Amino acid sequence: KKGSFASRKTDDMLLLQETERALADKSSPKVIFLHMIGSHPNPCDRLNSWPNYYLEQYPRKIACYLASISKLDNFLGQLDGILRRHSRHFAMLYFSDHGLSVSDSANPVHHDGHVQGGYSVPLIITASDITSHQSVSRKINARNFAGIFQWLTGIRTENITPFNPLTDEDNEPVMVFNGEKNVPADSLKPQPLILPDHR
């Protein structure tokens, strides 16, 4: 894909077919990067034919955003299944480059550099040798990504130390760029919850 996230409404689900195609070639080990467009505004454009079960409880764009998260969950589940079918050994790492804020404003789904939700994104790891679910609620700074990648893949470089997000601690404060300057992530206000309408 060329252009910005809004230049074409290509369905992220098409990446699953491309992944199947790449894994069919068994000639060498692979590192595959999938760049999904995800829930960018307007999230309704990202659903394509995905069902939206939230329309009766939330305003349309917020409902679309929630449905897009459901679609992402399904995508990751399908991707995990593809990897399990094709590979004896695999690891999958998912993260988002930024969060989205949801409000009842005229532009209800948007990136907001002044709330914690703009930077609090999931980091999901599955692998063929992971046998139990483990959840970590502490903040992990994105600057540790290269170390996490090394820890997960076994690829090593001289200048970066592997970083296990389950056990390794990073005592540096998490700093984020709020659109104007770097600020401590903890200084940002929390995102208020949008409760469903009881129609």
Model-derived features: positions:
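Non-catalytic, well-ordered alpha-helical segments in soluble enzyme domains
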Residues: A127-I130, S135-L166
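Metal-dependent active-site segment of extracytoplasmic phospho-/sulfohydrolases and closely related
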Residues: K71-H110, F149-T153
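Localized sequence-composition bias
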Residues: M92, E172-P173
